[in-house]
């Protein structure tokens, strides 16, 4: 089996970009170690702090954020970073070539129940000149690399550099990421969907109707039965979609009119959309292709519908969108 370093060489990935990816991967190994120790290391539970989104930060949110910041500062290739846990962009190295956006611990509400969590990252080119928030406001099409690390029964890294999606598994003895799936591919059709049904009454009419038709199964207009899955961590739900197909959605809702969207564009939706498109799937807000969105702020939120291409098309048809044109 190829190691991650060997794979990056075989794909002729730019040397400095490969170095950055290896830094992210090495840091995820340390994060995996911290997650596994959990209560034994006293890292579970919440702090008394909130992040810029107004969410109470878990101890591991802060620990993993600091681990990634420290590693990226030492790497030398990074101009600046943006994190879910940082109010503002962070300047790293004046000579850096890349910008890194990340969610250090996606699904952190799962920590205290010992369920799935992960790290999501996106790499963008660093523009010339002074580093500001505007430096990061590039569409997802500009991403040079994206991926996530899933801390589950095995620690797994899903990665794209624009040459398909590869899956690596962390060997528990050698502590190396080894290539275990060279070509992740999302089947175009599916009978699985992932959504937080508790928000059903707050959705827009198109999503209400779409899900209602799925639940009708064989007796409904879709004429087949669907199963629902929900992990409550985007990284886990998207990993399932990449592994066996499906559709994942966190749609617009009016539960809190000031926050109609849940997921963040720069370090959740964009990297996941890049992975999904590279694996043959589609990713949309319901009205716009995610990777085509021009960001307006680093913590911008968007609706997300992604997964098996034909099922995403079916969902979009309820929104009056024909994505096959």
UniProtKB/Swiss-Prot annotation:
One of the record's GO molecular function terms: fructose 1,6-bisphosphate 1-phosphatase activity
Annotated disulfide bonds: none
Keywords for this protein: Carbohydrate metabolism, Cytoplasm, Hydrolase, Magnesium, Metal-binding
Residues that coordinate or bind Mg(2+) 1: 84, 103, 105
Keyword Lyase belongs to the record: no
Keyword Glycoprotein: no
A GO CC annotation given for this chain: cytosol
Record's catalysed reaction(s): beta-D-fructose 1,6-bisphosphate + H2O = beta-D-fructose 6-phosphate + phosphate
Pathway field: Carbohydrate biosynthesis; gluconeogenesis
Gene3D superfamilies listed in its UniProt record: 3.40.190.80, Fructose-1,6-Bisphosphatase, subunit A, domain 1
Subcellular location: Cytoplasm
SUPFAM superfamilies: Carbohydrate phosphatase (SSF56655)
EC number of this enzyme: 3.1.3.11
Reported cofactor(s): Mg(2+)
Cofactor note: Binds 2 magnesium ions per subunit.
Protein name: Fructose-1,6-bisphosphatase class 1
């Amino acid at each position: 089996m190829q190691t991650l370093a060997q794979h990056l060489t075989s794909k002729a990935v730019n040397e400095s970009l490969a170095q950055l990816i290896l830094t992210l991967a090495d840091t995820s190994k340390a994060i995996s170690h911290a997650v596994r120790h959990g209560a034994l290391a006293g890292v579970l539970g919440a702090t008394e702090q909130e992040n810029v989104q107004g969410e109470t930060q878990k101890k591991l949110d802060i620990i993993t954020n600091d681990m990634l910041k420290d590693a990226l500062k030492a790497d030398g290739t990074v101009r600046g970073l943006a994190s879910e846990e940082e109010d503002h962009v962070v300047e790293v190295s004046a000579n850096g070539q890349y910008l890194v956006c990340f969610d250090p611990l996606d699904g952190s509400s799962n920590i205290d129940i010992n369920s799935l969590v992960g790290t999501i990252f996106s790499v963008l080119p660093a523009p010339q000149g002074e580093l500001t928030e505007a430096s990061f406001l590039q569409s997802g099409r500009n991403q040079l690399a994206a991926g996530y690390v899933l801390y589950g029964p095995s620690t797994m890294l899903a990665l794209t550099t624009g040459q398909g999606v590869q899956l690596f598994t962390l060997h528990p003895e050698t502590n190396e990421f080894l290539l275990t799936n060279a070509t992740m591919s999302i089947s175009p059709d599916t009978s699985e969907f992932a959504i937080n049904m508790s928000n059903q009454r707050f959705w827009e009419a198109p999503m209400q109707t779409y899900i209602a038709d799925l639940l009708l199964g064989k007796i409904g207009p879709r004429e087949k039965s669907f199963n629902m899955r929900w992990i409550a961590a985007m990284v886990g739900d998207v990993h399932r979609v990449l592994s066996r197909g499906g559709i994942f959605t966190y749609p617009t809702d009016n539960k809190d009119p000031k926050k109609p969207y849940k997921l963040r564009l720069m370090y959740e939706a964009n990297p996941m959309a890049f992975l999904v498109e590279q694996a043959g799937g589609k990713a949309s807000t319901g009205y716009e292709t995610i990777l085509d969105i021009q960001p307006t702020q680093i913590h911008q939120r968007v609706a997300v519908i992604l997964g098996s291409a034909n099922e995403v098309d079916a969902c979009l048809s309820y929104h009056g969108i024909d994505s096959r044109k």
